[in-house]
Design a protein with these regions (language model features):
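N-terminal cap/lid subdomain of alpha/beta-hydrolase-fold enzymes
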Residues: 54-114
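Short beta-strand/loop motif that positions the catalytic acidic residue
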Residues: 299, 305-307
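Alpha/beta-hydrolase-fold enzymes
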Residues: 173-174, 179-262
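Catalytic active-site module of serine/aspartate enzymes centered on a nucleophile-bearing elbow/loop
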Residues: 329-368
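Cap/lid segment of the alpha/beta-hydrolase catalytic domain
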Residues: 88-135, 190-191, 195-202, 339-340
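Short alpha-helix in the alpha/beta-hydrolase fold that links the catalytic acid
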Residues: 288-292, 301, 312-325
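Conserved acidic catalytic loop of the alpha/beta-hydrolase fold
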Residues: 127-151
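Acidic catalytic loop of the alpha/beta-hydrolase fold
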Residues: 282, 309-314
Length: 368
């Protein structure tokens, strides 16, 4: 496996979301070759499969610390840049920040980047993603060893699932993780949420159950997907206390219509399903026969847990239980916000307080 500078060479017929296409066109994105990479299910990735990534800050090997920032659900690397840079949450005055794209997100190897006739990719597990990231870092000369561990793995949502996987699978390879609005595994309530948005997509006539893919963009299915997501992605008081007005929306209906529906309207549905499968499968306890206590007992990193008190699927209660299992290895700093899950991705102007809270505690973690 090796790095290559091509853009989208793994696709004879690119579809993908507009965001993914913009990310692929980024002149600084690079692709690490995953040809022949063995997935956990035993399947080998085909020739041309790659892990897309971008490096920010000082060149690797010049003495700066290393931060890994994996992407989250339906996010691509350039959408995370609002918190990367000098003086930002991930400060490139002090750290080199490496952002790998999730397999299935339309930038790394994904359904939208292959000919559907070739067959859609199987499950990309969180473990598969982290193993690919480790191979990338080793190629880049980042040791990920007990002698030279990563300074931080920072992850929001599905990125937090990956951060936890790093800490459990390779306890000596990372000094710290920050898990923002995420968890060590996908819980039962979370699975119910994922099942509902998956069912919304597949209810569209464009879904070909026999082939296991969409024959055309499922316009109605994507609208239903966005409508359901709007009930889960923010906290209950976002609606009951009309917090949406702070963000410039006239009503709850206006918020859904102008925020959630367009957010998913042009997504590639096959890529969404791939990422849903990755998310639903996530569980660090796979390393310990299903025992979460034992899995978290493997963690040697300092762990910053930042759930949102109103997150409706990565819940505060689950984070509290994980914090208790981690004990004094954990710094527990909940975000108090009506924005719910969105609070952990504070790129919107109305989330300035949430952004400041996250930055403050990441800085404190890195100072330890």
């Amino acid at each position: 496996m090796h790095a290559c500078a091509h853009h989208g060479a793994q696709s004879p017929q690119q579809r993908g979301s507009p965001a993914a296409r913009r990310a692929l066109a980024d002149p600084r994105v690079r692709h690490f070759d995953l040809s022949g990479f063995e997935l956990g299910c035993g399947r080998l990735l085909p020739v041309g499969a790659s892990l897309a990534y971008k490096v920010h800050g000082p060149p690797i090997g010049q003495g700066a610390g290393i931060v890994l920032h994996p992407t989250s659900f339906d996010a691509v690397h350039n959408e995370l840049e609002y918190q990367i840079g000098p003086g930002q949450t991930l400060d490139t005055a002090r750290y080199t920040v490496i952002v790998p794209n999730l397999l299935g997100n339309g930038v790394s190897y994904s359904p939208s980047l292959i000919d559907p006739a070739a067959g859609l990719p199987p499950l990309f597990s969180v473990r598969d993603n982290v193993r690919a990231q480790r191979a990338l870092l080793e190629h880049l000369g980042v040791g990920c060893s007990k002698e030279a561990p990563l300074d931080l793995v920072y992850g929001y949502s599905m990125g937090a699932l990956q951060a936890y996987e790093w800490a459990v699978a390779w306890p000596e390879s990372v000094r710290r993780i920050a898990a923002v609005c995420g968890a060590a595994r996908c819980g039962e309530l979370n699975r119910v949420f994922l099942g509902s948005i998956e069912a919304a997509l597949k209810a569209d006539a464009a879904w070909d159950a026999a082939a296991g893919r969409f024959t055309r963009p499922p316009t109605r299915g994507l609208a239903a997907f966005g409508s359901i997501y709007a009930g889960w992605g923010v906290g209950s008081s976002w609606y009951t206390e009309a917090e949406y007005a702070r963000a410039g929306f006239a009503s709850a209906e206006d918020f859904v219509e102008r925020s959630y529906l367009p957010a998913f309207a042009n997504c590639d549905a096959d890529d969404l399903l791939s990422q849903i499968r990755t998310w639903r499968d996530a569980d660090v306890a796979v390393h310990t026969g299903g025992d979460l206590r034992a899995a978290l007992g493997r963690v040697r990193a300092r762990v910053l847990l930042m759930p949102c008190d109103q997150d409706r699927y990565f819940t505060l209660g689950e984070a509290e239980r994980e914090a208790a299992l981690l004990g004094d290895r954990c710094v527990f700093r909940p975000i108090v916000s009506a924005a719910g899950h969105r609070a952990g991705d504070p790129h919107r102007p109305e989330l300035g307080a949430e952004a400041t809270w996250i930055r403050r505690h990441v800085y404190e973690l890195l100072a330890e």
